[in-house]
């Protein structure tokens, strides 16, 4: 977890309500300060640094994109403007084009009113807490002392529509075959993948039906996408396809639906692809990196299939940090952020979709069969407002109650009590074989936390 107390940056960049808390003025300043920090080590003194900029389909995206680009140009940085494109495509193109940094304007799976700014370093990875802290220090200085070049010292912006095709060609190379004859349903969340789905999946030979591919600036994630898979499940059943694939607003997540309309979440996708890689001898250390929020059914399925797991804090950045630190090549989150480190530096919904379809084609198995070993346990999460979340988490009575519940579970269930990273909340999460037991155990622990809450 971060040792820095960050004011603007959260776990996934700078986010807020567009034109309210995330204003064009702030975006301009982020362009100046972020640009200065990220390009200070640019190698060629005779050439201006280059930053690439993409966005999702939100109505505020153009406004914020223009503002941050103006900030970059004002400190002498050239910009390649990608237009509407996915977040993982920006990460890929930073490396492919040897740019000094990348920026995506997006709020991922959030509603249309929100937006955000994600930075990538020249290695294609999200920024470290240290770099974010340095940007914030510059942002909060009382006077802007950064360079203000003029004439030919200013940056220049150019459109780069070829970026999309480069990214799609890269994706196709991650599987060694086409997908001829596969029948699928695709949900673009009215977001960044909307214009890419038909191009990619037609080239690979699939037959497909789509929804959520008509963005109007306001309908991103609205009743569609990876956080709203019910519409896709209906489309799958109506059209008798082999699988449904739902992406989020910026294309870094995937939630699948099997041929029966049942949800295949990130845990199941990690198991399916991990088992396939392991059987091929390609899963490093026979292990998958996941967060503490992955379901106990996922962990049991891994163990029953000769694999192990490494747990991290919640957030795909922490998954990636662990993957780099311990040299693993598969990791992700229940929410559908899946990282294939052999190919990518961040979660990528389209890349994950291709790997999942490839496993289906190679094994000849239905998606429901591949997911069957993962028996998802019922889960309940309760958020309790407390005066001091750290103190309550370590209260002897709370610890004793957790131990009592865990003893009753006898290994067939799980308790996770953790503080919120941003709010005065203690989160109590319980998984057990039945919903009745989940309710019983959750309330048992939550009642003790409430008694000790100090409120």
UniProtKB/Swiss-Prot annotation:
The gene is glmM. GO terms for molecular function: magnesium ion binding; phosphoglucosamine mutase activity; phosphomannomutase activity. Keywords: Isomerase, Magnesium, Metal-binding, Phosphoprotein. PANTHER family: PHOSPHOGLUCOMUTASE (ALPHA-D-GLUCOSE-1,6-BISPHOSPHATE-DEPENDENT), PHOSPHOHEXOSE MUTASE. Gene3D superfamilies: Alpha-D-Glucose-1,6-Bisphosphate, subunit A, domain 3 (3.40.120.10), Alpha-D-phosphohexomutase, C-terminal domain (3.30.310.50). It is an enzyme of class 5 (isomerase). The keyword Magnesium applies. It holds the Pfam family PGM_PMM_II. It comes from Leuconostoc mesenteroides subsp. mesenteroides (strain ATCC 8293 / DSM 20343 / BCRC 11652 / CCM 1803 / JCM 6124 / NCDO 523 / NBRC 100496 / NCIMB 8023 / NCTC 12954 / NRRL B-1118 / 37Y). The active site is at residue 108. Its cofactor is Mg(2+). Mg(2+) binds at residues 108, 248, 250, 252. Catalyzes the conversion of glucosamine-6-phosphate to glucosamine-1-phosphate. This is Phosphoglucosamine mutase. GO terms for biological process: carbohydrate metabolic process; peptidoglycan biosynthetic process; UDP-N-acetylglucosamine biosynthetic process. InterPro entries: A-D-PHexomutase_a/b/a-I, A-D-PHexomutase_a/b/a-I/II/III, A-D-PHexomutase_a/b/a-II, A-D-PHexomutase_a/b/a-III, A-D-PHexomutase_C, A-D-PHexomutase_C_sf, A-D-PHexomutase_CS, Alpha-D-phosphohexomutase_SF. Binds 1 Mg(2+) ion per subunit. Belongs to the phosphohexose mutase family. Activated by phosphorylation. HAMAP family: GlmM_B (MF_01554_B). The modification Phosphoserine is found at residue 108. One of its GO terms (cellular component) is cytosol. Its EC number is 5.4.2.10. The keyword Phosphoprotein applies. It catalyses: alpha-D-glucosamine 1-phosphate = D-glucosamine 6-phosphate.
């Amino acid at each position: 977890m971060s040792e820095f107390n960050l004011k603007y940056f959260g776990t996934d960049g700078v986010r807020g309500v567009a034109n309210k808390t995330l204003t064009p003025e702030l975006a301009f300043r982020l362009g100046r300060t972020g640009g200065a920090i990220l390009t200070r080590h640019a190698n060629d003194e005779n050439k201006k640094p280059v930053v690439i900029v993409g966005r999702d389909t939100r109505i505020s995206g153009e406004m914020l994109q223009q503002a941050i680009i103006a900030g970059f140009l004002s400190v002498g940085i050239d910009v390649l403007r990608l237009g509407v494109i996915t977040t993982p495509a920006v990460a890929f193109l930073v490396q492919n084009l040897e740019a000094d940094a990348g920026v995506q304007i997006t709020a991922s799976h959030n509603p249309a009113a929100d937006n955000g700014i994600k930075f990538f370093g020249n290695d294609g990875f999200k920024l470290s807490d240290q770099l974010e802290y340095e940007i914030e220090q510059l942002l909060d200085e009382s006077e802007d002392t950064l360079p203000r070049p003029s004439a030919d010292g200013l940056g220049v912006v150019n459109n780069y529509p070829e970026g999309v095709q480069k990214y799609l060609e890269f994706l196709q190379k991650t599987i060694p075959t086409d997908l001829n004859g596969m029948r699928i349903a695709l949900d673009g969340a009215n977001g960044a993948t909307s214009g890419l789905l038909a191009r990619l999946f037609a080239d690979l030979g699939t037959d497909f039906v789509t929804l959520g591919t008509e963005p109007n600036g306001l309908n991103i994630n609205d009743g569609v996408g990876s956080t709203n898979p019910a519409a896709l499940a209906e489309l799958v059943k109506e059209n008798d396809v082999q699988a449904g694939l739902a992406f989020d607003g910026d294309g870094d997540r995937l939630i699948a639906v099997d041929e029966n309309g049942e949800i295949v979440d990130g845990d199941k996708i990690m198991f399916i692809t991990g088992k396939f890689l392991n059987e091929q001898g390609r899963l490093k250390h026979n292990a998958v990196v996941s967060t503490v929020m992955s379901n106990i059914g996922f962990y049991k399925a891994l163990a029953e299939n000769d694999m192990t797991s490494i747990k991290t804090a919640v957030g795909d950045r922490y998954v990636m940090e662990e993957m780099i630190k311990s040299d693993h090549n598969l990791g992700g989150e229940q929410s559908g952020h899946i990282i294939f480190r052999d190919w990518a530096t961040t979660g990528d919904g389209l890349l994950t979709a291709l790997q999942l379809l490839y496993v289906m084609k190679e094994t000849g198995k239905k998606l429901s069969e591949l997911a069957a070993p993962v028996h998802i346990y019922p889960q309940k999460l309760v958020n309790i407002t407390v005066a001091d979340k750290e103190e309550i988490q370590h209260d002897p009575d709370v610890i004793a109650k957790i131990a009592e519940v865990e003893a009753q579970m006898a290994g067939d269930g799980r308790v996770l009590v953790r503080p919120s990273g941003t709010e005065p909340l203690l989160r109590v999460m319980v998984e057990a074989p039945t919903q009745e037991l989940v309710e019983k155990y959750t309330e048992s622990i939550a009642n003790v936390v409430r008694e000790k809450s100090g409120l």
